[in-house]
C-alpha cells in the first residue's frame, strides 16, 4: 500500500514519498508528513541480528513505499559504505551512566552525515521516477553542520547544484573552514551577516515564492532542500534509533520490548522528531528528553505550552542549536492538533506575525512523553571536563548539553530507565570550546594545535575531515546581507 504524505498547512496537498523528497517544502510553507506511520513488520529480535544497512532498509521501505526494493537498497548501500570510519556506522558507547549513540563517524564528522549521505541518492532516484528534466538546485540554510554534510553529499552529483547559506559570525572556525574549502563545480557557499534564523527564513521565502519558481522553471531549474524540513532527511534519522535499540538487545542490556529513554540535543527539532516517529513505528521509547542550550525556546515551550521566539538570540559554544525558530516542531504541532492542517496553519501564521503562539491544554496533554531541559554555557563546559576526568571520554559541546540535561533529569525524576544520548558531533569539530573546558591553559594555542592536543588526550585519531582542511585553500568567500540572498542565488545560476 502506498503511503501518502500531506502538507501540515493544507489537507488537500498530497505527495508520494519521492514527490515530497523532490519538493522539500510543501506549498504555503507547510511540511510534508506521512498520513500514518506503519508499524515495523520485523521483530525487534530479528532486527538485532541485522547490520546498519539491513535495519535501514526495514525502516525506510515502510516510509518510502514508492521506491522499489532495488532502488532503496542501492541508495542505502551507496550511502553507508567506506565514507564512514567504522563498519558499525553508528556505534553505541557506554560511558558515564548512559549509552552514547555516536552519530559522527561519517565524512564531515557530524550527525548530519547520517541523512545527508543518502539524500543525494534518494533525490536523484526521485527525479528519475518523476521524469524531472530540470536541474535541481539544493537550497540550504545551516547553523554549522548541515552545510558541510550537504555540500559533501551533493558535490559533483550530476543534475544538481547546491547553495549553502550560513551565519558568517555564528559557526565555529572549523565548521567555517570545512565549508569554505569545499570542492565541486556545482557548490556555492555564502556567509550572511545575520543569524541562522535569518538564513532559514530567507531560504523558506525563496521556496514559497511562486514567481521565482516559474522563472527558475523557464531557465531549467527547480529548488529542493537538504534541510531537515525535507522528509528525505527525517526518515533516515529514524533508522539510528531503531539500530541503537537493537544493539542494546543484542548485547543483553535490555530485552526486546523493554523501554528506553532518549536524550537529544535539539535545535531545529528534526533529530528528536525522528526518534518520536521511530516510537510511532513501534520502538519502545518511554521519554524523549529535549535538551536546549541558552536559546531555550523549546524548553520553555514544553514547560509552559507557549512558543515564543521574541527573545534575544544568544551565540553559544553549541552553535548548531542556536535557533529560535525550530522548523520541525511544526510536524509535532500538526500531530497533537489531531492532524488538523487548518489549526496548525493558524498557529504558524501567529508565529510568523506575532512571534508567539500557545497550544491548548488538550494539545499539551499529548506531550506527556516529552521532557524539556537546558544547559548553560558554564554547565556544558563543566560536563565536558567532568566526563573526561571520570571516564576518559571526550564529547563535543552539543553532546555535553544533552549529558548535562540528562543528569538534571535523573536528579529531578529518579528515572533510571536505560538511556541513549544522541552524540551529534565529533569533539574535533569544536576543538577550542572542548579543550578550553578541559583546561583553560589551552586558550593560547591555535585551532590546529588544539586538534593535535585533542588527539593526545583522547587517543582518537584525527579524522580525515580535519586533516583535509588543515592546508586546504579557501574557495568560497561570498558574503551578503539577508536581503540579498535571492540575487546571490540568481547570480550563481547565471539567470
Question: What is each of the regions a protein language model found here?
Answer:
Residues 1-495:
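PLP-dependent amino-acid enzyme catalytic core
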Amino acid at each position: 500500500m502506498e503511503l501518502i504524505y500531506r502538507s501540515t498547512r493544507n489537507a488537500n496537498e498530497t505527495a508520494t514519498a519521492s514527490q515530497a523528497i523532490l519538493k522539500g517544502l510543501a506549498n504555503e510553507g507547510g511540511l510534508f508528513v506521512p498520513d500514518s506511520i506503519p508499524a515495523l513488520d520485523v521483530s525487534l529480535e530479528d532486527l538485532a541480528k541485522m547490520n546498519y544497512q539491513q535495519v535501514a532498509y526495514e525502516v525506510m521501505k515502510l516510509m518510502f513505499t514508492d521506491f522499489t526494493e532495488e532502488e532503496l537498497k542501492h541508495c542505502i548501500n551507496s550511502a553507508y559504505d567506506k565514507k564512514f570510519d567504522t563498519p558499525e556506522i553508528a556505534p553505541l558507547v557506554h560511558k558515564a551512566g548512559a549509552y552514547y549513540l555516536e552519530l559522527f563517524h561519517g565524512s564531515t564528522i557530524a550527525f548530519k552525515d547520517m541523512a545527508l549521505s543518502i539524500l543525494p541518492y534518494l533525490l536523484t532516484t526521485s527525479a528519475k521516477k518523476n521524469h524531472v528534466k530540470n536541474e535541481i538546485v539544493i537550497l540550504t540554510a545551516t547553523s554549522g553542520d548541515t552545510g558541510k554534510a550537504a555540500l559533501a553529499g551533493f558535490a559533483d552529483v550530476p543534475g544538481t547544484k547546491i547553495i549553502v547559506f550560513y551565519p558568517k559570525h555564528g559557526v565555529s572556525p572549523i565548521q567555517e573552514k570545512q565549508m569554505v574549502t569545499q570542492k565541486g563545480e556545482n557548490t556555492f557557499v555564502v556567509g550572511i551577516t545575520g543569524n541562522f534564523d535569518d538564513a532559514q527564513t530567507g531560504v523558506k521565502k525563496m521556496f514559497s515564492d511562486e514567481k521565482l519558481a516559474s522563472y527558475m522553471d523557464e531557465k531549467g531549474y527547480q529548488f529542493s532542500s537538504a534541510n531537515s524540513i525535507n522528509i528525505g532527511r527525517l526518515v533516515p534519522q529514524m533508522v539510528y534509533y531503531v539500530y541503537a535499540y537493537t544493539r542494546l538487545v543484542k548485547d543483553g542490556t535490555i530485552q526486546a520490548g523493554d523501554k528506553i529513554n532518549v536524550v537529544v540535543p535539539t535545535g531545529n527539532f528534526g533529530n528528536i522528531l525522528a526518534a518520536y516517529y521511530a516510537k510511532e513505528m513501534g520502538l519502545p521509547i518511554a521519554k524523549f528528553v529535549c535538551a536546549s542550550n541558552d536559546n531555550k525556546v523549546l524548553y520553555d515551550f514544553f514547560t509552559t505550552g507557549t512558543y515564543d521566539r521574541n527573545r534575544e538570540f544568544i551565540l553559544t559554544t553549541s552553535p548548531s542549536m542556536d535557533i529560535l525558530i525550530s522548523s520541525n516542531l511544526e510536524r509535532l504541532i500538526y500531530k497533537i492538533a489531531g492532524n488538523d492542517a487548518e489549526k496548525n496553519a493558524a498557529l504558524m501564521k501567529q508565529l510568523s506575525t506575532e512571534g508567539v503562539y500557545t497550544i491548548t491544554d488538550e494539545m499539551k496533554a499529548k506531550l506527556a512523553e516529552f521532557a524539556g531541559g537546558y544547559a548553560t554555557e558554564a554547565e556544558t563546559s563543566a560536563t565536558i571536563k567532568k566526563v573526561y576526568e571520570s571516564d576518559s571520554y571526550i564529547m563535543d559541546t552539543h553532546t555535553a548539553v544533552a549529558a548535562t540535561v540528562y543528569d538534571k533529569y535523573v536528579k529531578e525524576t529518579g528515572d533510571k530507565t536505560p538511556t541513549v544520548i544522541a552524540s551529534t558531533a565529533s569533539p574535533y569539530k569544536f576543538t577550542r570550546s572542548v579543550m578550553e573546558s578541559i583546561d583553560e591553559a589551552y586558550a593560547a594555542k591555535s585551532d590546529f594545535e588544539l586538534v593535535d592536543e585533542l588527539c593526545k588526550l583522547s587517543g582518537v585519531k584525527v579524522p580525515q575531515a580535519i586533516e583535509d582542511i588543515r592546508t586546504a585553500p579557501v574557495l568560497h568567500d561570498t558574503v551578503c546581507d539577508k536581503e540579498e540572498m535571492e540575487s546571490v542565488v540568481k547570480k550563481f545560476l547565471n539567470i
